[in-house]
From Swiss-Prot:
Gene (name only): dauC
Disulfide bonds listed in the record: none
Record note on disruption phenotype: Cells lacking this gene accumulate aklanonate.
EC number: 2.1.1.288
Function recorded in the entry: Involved in the biosynthesis of aklavinone which is an important precursor common to the formation of the clinically significant anthracyclines such as carminomycin, daunorubicin (daunomycin), rhodomycin, aclacinomycin T (aklavin) and aclacinomycin A (aclarubicin). These compounds are aromatic polyketide antibiotics that exhibit high cytotoxicity and are widely applied in the chemotherapy of a variety of cancers. Catalyzes the methyl esterification of aklanonic acid to yield aklanonic acid methyl ester.
Protein's name according to its UniProt entry: Aklanonic acid methyltransferase DauC
Classification lineage: Bacteria, Bacillati, Actinomycetota, Actinomycetes, Kitasatosporales
CDD domains, per database record: AdoMet_MTases (cd02440)
GO molecular function: methyltransferase activity
Assembly description: Homodimer.
InterPro entries according to UniProt: Methyltransf_25 (IPR041698), SAM-dependent_MTases_sf (IPR029063)
Keywords, in A-Z order: Antibiotic biosynthesis, Methyltransferase, S-adenosyl-L-methionine, Transferase
Reactions performed catalytically: aklanonate + S-adenosyl-L-methionine = methyl aklanonate + S-adenosyl-L-homocysteine
Length: 220
């Protein structure tokens, strides 16, 4: 699948789900967004970029942390997500937030624009995630930092599902899955550099990052 076709599908999927995103069923992205903000520790006055901001799982907690002296910029490829986030920002009376439709793979900001770049379950959707990570390093100021979350990718299991669930999926369903959606293909397609901790460290160091820290959280 070509990157342009894939991105159109991603945009359409998130656009169509924007009105109910993380509002039906069990909450997931909202608590995980708060968790990411807690880990990344934005402080008063900082400039924050939230990539793939969705409806604001990270955006709003970060805005509270940086206060009126700071600012949080949210970007998302799906216009529907930006519209929903903008509505909520207005309802909350937040003036330290800006939102725009933008492809997170090629952020259009000058060098050293931000103190913190965050991405909650968004980096994994970028066809050239490693290239994007390198570009984020360029728009971070000296001493800036990046924080992002991802499901655990393991060969033979499905992303976003605990490994224990894989044996519960009917074999008949697995046999009829398109090749590109089988576990091994998903791991290859969605960033094999996330499969092992050492791969992640090596990738981030190659993009110019240092003093790396990892943590694992379970939701639910």
């Amino acid at each position: 699948m070509q990157d342009s076709s894939y991105k159109k599908q991603v945009t359409q999927a998130f656009d169509q789900s924007s009105s109910t995103y993380d509002r039906l069923g069990v909450e997931f992205f909202t608590p995980m967004g708060r968790r990411l903000v807690d880990i990344s520790e934005p402080v008063t006055g900082e400039r924050v970029l939230d990539i793939g901001c969705g409806r604001g799982a990270c955006l709003f907690p970060a805005a509270e942390k940086v206060g009126s002296q700071g600012c949080v910029h949210g970007i998302d490829i799906a216009p529907g997500m930006i519209e929903e986030a903008r509505k909520e920002a207005t309802e909350r009376g937040l003036r330290n937030i800006s939102l725009m439709v933008m492809d997170a793979e090629t952020p259009g900001f000058p060098a050293r624009s931000f103190d913190l770049v965050m991405g909650s379950y968004s980096v994994i959707f970028l066809p050239d995630a490693v290239g994007a990570l390198a570009r984020y390093a360029d728009i971070l100021d000296h001493g800036g930092r990046i924080a992002f979350t991802s499901p655990v990718f393991r060969a033979g299991t499905f992303p976003f599902l605990p490994p224990e669930f894989t044996p519960l999926i009917p074999q008949a369903l697995l046999e009829h899955l398109p090749e590109q959606w089988r576990p091994e293909a998903l791991v290859r397609r969605f960033n094999s550099w996330l499969e092992r901790a050492e791969d992640l460290v090596r990738t981030l160091e190659g993009c110019g990052y240092a003093r790396l820290r990892q943590s694992t959280s379970r939701c639910g």
